[in-house]
């Protein structure tokens, strides 16, 4: 198998895994928002966060479509992925806030 074919297969595999991870965390973020009380995140912030998660999932779907439509291996720029990474970090932050809130609620 030529090296460029192997590199293309590796790139496809890595991107598929990365996009699946983004999907997982964006879905997890939506689930967390549904159980998030107002004392942790007010309704306006929850709505805005949820909208950004939906937009990011649409971007991931569009990226997948472009990758599948291409006859050549393609990469995704860091400029495109940076906002997704930031959003995943926000999901982790929300998970931490909810855990602290749950702990506080059980202690009071």
Regions found by a protein language model. Give the residues of each.
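Short terminal alpha-helical segments
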Residues: 1-38
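A structural signal for well-ordered alpha-helices, especially hydrophobic packing surfaces
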Residues: 19, 23-33, 57-60, 64, ...
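Amphipathic alpha-helical binding modules
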Residues: 71-108
